[in-house]
Structures are given as C-alpha cells and as structure tokens.
Amino acid sequence: MAASSTATRLSPPRLHAPTTPSPHLPLRRSRFSPLRAAKLEAVLTIGTHLIPHPRKAETGGEDAFFVNGDDGGVFAVADGVSGWAEKDVNPALFSRELMAHTSTFLKDEEVNHDPQLLLMKAHAATTSVGSATVIIAMLEKTGILKIASVGDCGLKVIRKGQVMFSTCPQEHYFDCPYQLSSEAIGQTYLDALVCTVNLMEGDMIVSGSDGFFDNIFDQEIVSVISESPGVDEAAKALAELARKHSVDVTFDSPYSMEARSRGFDVPSWKKFIGGKLIGGKMDDITVIVAQVKAVMIPDDEGVDEEKGQGDEQGSAVAVASSEQKEDSITT
C-alpha cells in the first residue's frame, strides 16, 4: 500500500527584503549591473558530518549522503540495511550507489524539483544487492521545501528555537523500517512519505539517519543549533553528541524509550529489582544541518544588455556560485 501524505501548510513563504533606503539619500548604483528590478530567492547553506559505527570505522560505515547547492539546494541521506551482511553482502554498496544516482538524476529535466520522482529514478538505476532507508529534500527558490522519505531517516525544521515540523518514520514493526531494496518485496517510490513545508528565512533544517535520531532528543538539537556559529559547526556538534549518547549504557535514549513503549524490556527478574532497558544505540550517525537564507537575484530583464559591459558581473556571479555550490557524495 502506498503511504503518501502532504504536510499542512505551516506558514506563508516569507523572505525579507533589505530595508528601503532613505528618500533623502541618493541611490547607489551597483558596480556590477545597472539599476533594475530584483527578486529574493531562498537558498540553503548546508553543513554535514558523518561518524561511522565504532566497529565499522575502517570501512566508513553504511550511511551515505548527497548534497548539492544548485537552485535552492538539495540533500539526501541513505542508510544501508546492515542485515545484508549476514548474506555476505556489503550493505554500504546499495546506499552509496543510490546516492550516486541521486546526484546524476538531479540534472534530469523530468525530475523538476520532484523528490519522489528523483527517488524513483535513482532506485531504478541502482544495481547493487541490498536495501536502504532514504530521505531526499529539495528547496525551491520560493521557500517551499519538498521531501520524500522511505523508512526512518528523518528531518526536522526548527524556527525561533522550536521544532515546528518533523517527518514520521515508516516501519513494518519496531526496528524494521520501510526500505528501498534490490528485491521485489521491498518498497518503492510510491510508498514514500511525501511532505511539503513552507519555510522562512532563518529556519534551520536538521536531517539524518536513524543512528542520529535514535540517540538525541529534540531539546538537545535545538540547544546545539542555538549555540553553534554556523551549519558546519552545528552538524559536527550534533553528530558528536549523538555518538557520545550511543555508547553510554546509562543514557535513557529515544531508542530505549521507544523500545520499552513497544513492550521490549529486560527480564522480569531485573524489573523486580528496578532494572529497565536503557542505553544508547550504536550505529552509523549522519547529520545534515541547513539554514534557509534569502539572496537578492537581479531580474532577467536587461541581462543581454549587461553582457557587453565587461566581465565584472560574470566574475561576481562565479564567486557567488563557488561559495554557495556544493555537490558531493560522501560515505
């Protein structure tokens, strides 16, 4: 059965324009282009951090992710299902290839900012044996974030110090999430949870694999975000905190709390003496932190006219692109 839904519109898109100059001051002419109409577009500034499972550090773990700064910005996380190792299959191969194809098909005109369609194309092209949970998020220039997710990779939006949106994990039963697979019995893009969220300038997006969200609470995420000077620092700090919790046998983690709520616990004799299922969950930990920013984009009108005025504007655009564009696949 397909599990597709759309999130409620949370707020109208709002991108703040710069303050209007005083009428008593002369207008300053841009040194890059003639005065003309301009528009605001939403873009993502993205930071990432990955920490493999302690026992998989030498191989890099089974998580993979993809980040691209073109247009508004795109990122994706895939978590290879470790159970395939019992069949002598490297679980990392499927997740890595899936992310590689996500990068390739992002440039396909047919995708056109549709993460579910991108998921379909990337999955269809993946030939490695295995399976993975996955989430893809794409920001349109209007500030609309489109999400497609299969399984228990997650995403949260933080606005003004509060979590105002979270994806919901999909699972067959506890600890058995939906997953894209090389086998016919697995899920497909039609089973994806599809969400649309209207974002505002300054909103923070935190996404990652279940190894991250199983070991950290919302209030900790909000606290780290508020204390971090940038997205790179935030992603690293969040991953390190989740890693610390994951190896702490006394930490009552979100994972252990969920397990107890589903009926999993220590034997009765341990309960009798006050024992309970507790501790973090060791796993690969992938964290992506993105901040929504508004950039002023000149209107297309008059572009041809400017091309004859020298190379200065082209250089400015090239510098902006090199600072904003990030296109990578990391495992």
Swiss-Prot record:
Residues 48-292 form the PPM-type phosphatase domain. Residues 1-29, 300-331 are annotated as: Disordered. Keywords: Hydrolase, Magnesium, Manganese, Metal-binding, Protein phosphatase. The lineage of its organism: Eukaryota, Viridiplantae, Streptophyta, Embryophyta, Tracheophyta. Belongs to the PP2C family. It is an enzyme of class 3 (hydrolase). This is Probable protein phosphatase 2C 1. GO terms for molecular function: metal ion binding; protein serine/threonine phosphatase activity. The keyword Hydrolase applies. Its EC number is 3.1.3.16. Mn(2+) 1 binds at residues 79-80. Binds 2 magnesium or manganese ions per subunit.
